[in-house]
Amino acid sequence: MEHLGKVFREFRTSGNYSLKEAAGESWSTSQLSRFELGESDLAVSRFFEILDNIHVTIENFMDKARNFHNHEHVSMMAQIIPLYYSNDIAGFQKLQREQLEKSKSSTTPLYFELNWILLQGLICQRDATYDMKQDDLDKVADYLFKIEEWTMYELILFGNLYSFYDVDYVTRIGREVMEREEFYQEISRHKRLVLILALNCYQHCLEHSSFYNANYFEAYTEKIIDKGIKLYERNVFHLFKRFCLISKRTV
């Protein structure tokens, strides 16, 4: 992914290494410069070599790379939130055009294509005259299926698009996330996102009268919700529980 080059450049410059020092004997300075600019990729073996040249471990590098990737997405979400609450469809479409342009010039366009789909989902939520294409939903589902280690990005992506999927798929994906407790135990931000996702899955099951699956998400939410959780989420949870009781009586 091209942002890896940007992260490498941050490590190189902060360590006061020149392009020549970082490139070493296995790479030219022009090749390394293109990698830092996101204009080319490099083989894994060479990547490890240039990390050694600037004395950075792969663990430290990937940790910073994940944070860099999350920062990009958080920046986009900061633009999305005011558009969502003001029903600014034109603003969403402007962001979509920007994502499409980035995908055209990127060596790894999938990230920007997924962002476009996320924005389309938000547009559909605010204006029912727009619709989601099944091909786009399939692309997101295929991406999520292939990702073994979910980050904040995947949580936000699925958390904003779950309503377009059938209840069985939402239940399967939701369960997979819920059963990986180590993912959120030490990271409070992730824990809150997982809680919100559990509430979303719970609501989705209730709306489709899938009470057996709803019971799972109710029990899971009960387990992870605590006094540190904001009052809003707690109130939403109690509202859903009452709705569940009423719905079961009318079936």
Where are these regions (language model features)?
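A short, Lys/Arg-rich alpha-helix, primarily the initiator
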Residues: 1-14
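"A position-specific structural signal for the A-helix of alpha-solenoid helical repeats
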Residues: 7, 78, 112-126, 156-160, ...
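Short alpha-helical DNA-recognition segment
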Residues: 15-33
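DNA major-groove recognition helix of helix-turn-helix/homeodomain DNA-binding modules
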Residues: 45-60
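Short, charged recognition helix plus adjacent turn
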Residues: 63-91
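Alpha-solenoid helical repeat architecture
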Residues: 66-77, 107-115, 150-157, 188-196, ...
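Helix-turn-helix repeat elements of alpha-solenoid scaffolds
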Residues: 85-98, 129-138, 167-179, 208-219
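Amphipathic alpha-helical segments of tetratricopeptide repeats
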Residues: 97-104, 138-145, 178-185, 218-226
